[in-house]
Amino acid sequence: MKKTKIVATLGPASSPKETLREMFLNGLNVCRINFSHGSYEEHAAVIQTIRELNEETGLNVAILGDLQGPKIRTGVMNNDSVELIDGSEVIISTKELLGTEVSFSINYADLPKDVEAGEHILLDDGKLVLEVVSTNSIDTITTKVLHGGILSSKKGVNFPNTKISMPCLTEKDLNDLDFALEMDIDWIGLSFVRSARDIIELRHLISKKMKSAKIIAKIEKPEAVMDIDEIVKETDGLMVARGDLGVEVPYQNVPLIQKAIINKGIQHAKPVIVATQMMESMITNISPTRAEVNDVANAVLDGADAVMLSGETSVGKNPVQVIKTMDTIVKEMESFDGIYEKEELPERNQARFITDSICFNACRLGTRVNAKAILTMSFSGYTGYKIASMRPNSDIFVFTSNRKILTQLSLVWGVRAYYYDKTVSTDHTIADIKFLLKKQELVNEGDLVINIASMPIESHGNSNMLKLSYVE
């Protein structure tokens, strides 16, 4: 059973039902809907397709709705592109104007208040670099071109040294969030997170709608890297969004930041997605480059919960082949023993000390006796997250009467969730779920399995029971 999950961005190449079915059957675990593109009608149609396929295949593929965030862009250029010359002076205006080699506009009105002399402005993913000479703090910034080149219309702008004051959620994001919550999407990706406060604000909006969507904090700003300890406490999951991150921080720092964020996620039992350019050459090619194979492999070895595809599956020539290829790499890496057994002793002063201790000892016992699987009953999904964070070699099966977490758990390393709502007795439940797994050939007669539950079984309290037994 594959443990590291695969997230794929959907688009024109992967929206047809039969294409998506093949992706489901070849290892896809989470469908990402990118709100930067497409209409609500298109998104609603693909969400319906995902849910139909879950019914038809018996899988629980999750849906991640990715909010665009406050993307700052240049305005329109004369003849669609202009050349900025090294050493020349260029004016940036917040007033709309046709861009030339000496001036262009930007879509963020408060930028002149935010920037200071000496700070750098990066254009088109860092291909062009400007330095702020002065600002009138109203509508105009004077810059010097440090590294010139061709600047096209509507290109992204990054500010590696500047604290931007614009809100984390734009008006478009709020509309997209309303749609996502209305559609009961499992995970919400929050772009350009700068601090834990951004997560708290989004959670408040989700709670106001009385929804249970979980939050992925996309780490792509230097401020987020600095505040990672507070962010990881507030969020439900993390994404190492290496595209903008690699522009805003020195690119040579990204691999170590990736490893650090994955370790934080494991420490706090929060899933981590590694994203951007993982197999980008497969947008057009039938096989990945060797560097891409190593990139995916290293994310798995680092301990990522999931690896993500973007253009490869949204607009690529063969999205099914991309899923198959990534699935093959992931499974091969999971044969390496070094990715398992990351148990951390539970802290006695934690509110969930008893549950954490049960999970810790289940994983430790599983290693000692070579248990085939750890089976847990959970209403909130907490034990699934906690057990997964300890990276046991045993398979992890979560049984729940809470349908909302069935798909959410599909993002979590090693976890497979099943709907189960019988509560006759603890012994009956343990025997019954072993029988169900045996029927699906996920465990076999003679396998050792570990069961976790709360007693009495009908309560949704802390897990306080651990049982080791054979499958009969």
Where are these regions (language model features)?
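Non-catalytic helical/linker scaffolds that mediate oligomerization, partner binding
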Residues: 1-472
